[in-house]
A protein has these predicted regions:
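Glycine-rich phosphate-binding loops of nucleotide-dependent enzymes
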Residues: 2-257
Length: 257
């Protein structure tokens, strides 16, 4: 299977702080990769370099096997990369359709009718429930997230990055999102999920890549790993969670770490 994106020895520093150090990572087309790590491990910084928010100090980014230079989100879009951030970048007083086409040529008049038609086609293809004419301020958080995803797909994204996408969702909304992401994978898109939730990693992804303190630890097949292994990769030591039964008269379970 062909690689959609590859990172080779990517490093990023902020002053004396090393956010990412010689990180190597690859994601294939038609694959969901979970980027796992504790808070501060460098996950979002790494993805922000792919999406054009930051520029790496050193290293290479390859799209479809060719080295590229990404200095802005506009550059990222030109390479069919879309990132859905935790904090949505939408204009509240605009409709879903207006946000999706914002910045494109001919976004008014006849072209808007064609844009709306395309938005509906994308929604039907991936199972989104979106009203193109609904104002953003009238939407729930999950609906706003849907607009961001459709916006990326509308602009041709084949590589989608989602930063902690379930942090604002209910369990039912999370289940619905995962169904959509699997459809994208089956359609040949590369999907990267930034997360620290182990149970979601194991239920959704095909592979898991782990970062610790800004460094790449390794990548494992989801079907061949478990929470204990992933936790050890995240923190650098074994942590076993065992429930030990206390004396009967206390009737209290103790968590031993």
């Amino acid at each position: 299977m062909e690689y959609a994106i590859q990172l080779k020895n990517v490093t990023k520093t902020f002053g004396k702080v090393v956010a990412n150090k010689n990180v190597n990572l690859d994601v294939k087309k038609g694959e969901i990769l979970s980027l796992l790590g504790e808070n501060g491990s460098g996950k979002t910084t790494l993805m922000n370099m792919i999406s054009g928010i930051y520029f790496p100090d050193s290293g290479e980014i390859l799209i479809d096997g060719k080295e590229v230079v990404i200095r802005s989100p506009k550059d990222a879009f030109s390479y069919k990369i879309g990132m859905i951030h935790q904090h949505f970048k939408l204009v509240d007083v605009f409709t879903a359709a207006e946000n999706i086409v914002l910045g494109l040529k001919d976004e008014k008049g006849f072209a808007m009718k064609e844009y709306t038609k395309k938005i509906k086609q994308i929604s039907e293809l991936y199972g989104f429930d979106i009203d193109p004419d609904k104002k953003i301020y009238e939407m729930s958080v999950s609906e706003k997230q849907t607009v961001e995803i459709v916006k990326a797909l509308f602009r041709g994204a084949d590589i989608l990055i989602l930063d902690e996408p379930t942090a604002v969702l209910t369990p039912q909304e999370t289940k619905k999102l995962f169904k959509v992401l699997r459809r994208m994978r089956d359609d040949g898109k590369a999907v990267i999920i930034i997360t620290h939730k182990l149970h979601e990693v194991l239920s959704l992804s095909d592979k898991v890549a782990v970062l610790r303190k800004g460094e790449y630890i390794g990548t494992v097949n989801t079907a061949e790993t478990n929470e204990n292994q992933l936790t050890e990769m995240m923190v650098g030591k074994k942590i076993s969670l065992n429930i030990t039964r206390s004396e009967p008269e206390n009737s209290v379970d103790r968590l031993v770490v």
